[in-house]
Amino acid sequence: MNYLGFDIGGTKCAAVLGNREGRVLCREAFPTEGPDATLEKLFQAAESFSERACAAGVSCGGPLDEASGVILSPPNLPGWDRVEIVRKIRERLGIPVWLCNDANACALAEWRFGAGRGTRSMVFLTFGTGMGAGLILDGRLYSGACGNAGEIGHLRMERLGPVGYGKAGSFEGFASGGGIAQLARAAALEQFQQGKFTAYCRTPADLDSVTDKSTAQAAEAGDPT
């Protein structure tokens, strides 16, 4: 039996077809847009796959109402307010559908097929547009009473610092892709104020184009900033 997986991220989305052994048979990815445009692309990808799936799972950053299958209003998905994603996919594809927090879905996959195999307890950290955690405790996924047990991105690390989910100095602010870009822009601005520049940002006009990817590339190339 094969299964569909839809991952909805703040930067990009993906549709995959896989089997029970965790092998990916087909995959398509594309930039995230609004809910209607993104869903249509996910549907088209699923319908283009050569084999039919018997069920589908959707992973998405929270907050979610997993029981009713609704994406509430994730901070990294502007415009995705109360999207009844499970109903929409079920009606279009005619198969059972489940919604799961993306970090929890990753934790389950890693525990079942990856580095967590054979463990009783583990923590999976996600670092993307935002950040979060999935918890496997004593052989079971632990999501908490309201499904937010892994929302560690809200933890405050410093009184001041880059902003993640509206909170300065939060774990997400320091460690997510968006937070890393904020830190890199601040470092570049400090260099400009000293009459210097960085390899990843040579003029103040380039500040808005600094991303986590360009920052990582500069670090790999040996930029001391």
What are these regions (language model features)?
Residues D7, D102, G128:
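Active-site glycine-centered loops adjacent to acidic/histidine catalytic or metal-binding residues
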Residues T11:
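Conserved Rossmann-like nucleotide-cofactor binding loop
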Residues V16-R20, C26-E28, E33-A37, W98, ...:
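Glycine/GP-enriched mid-protein hinge/lid loop-to-helix segment characteristic of carbohydrate kinases
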Residues P35-F43, E47, C54-A55, D65-V123:
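Glycine-rich phosphate-binding loop and adjoining helix at the ATP-binding site
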Residues S59-C60, S73, F127, S176:
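A secondary-structure boundary/capping signal
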Residues C60, A67, N101, L137-D138:
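A cytosolic small-molecule/anion-sensing beta-strand core signal
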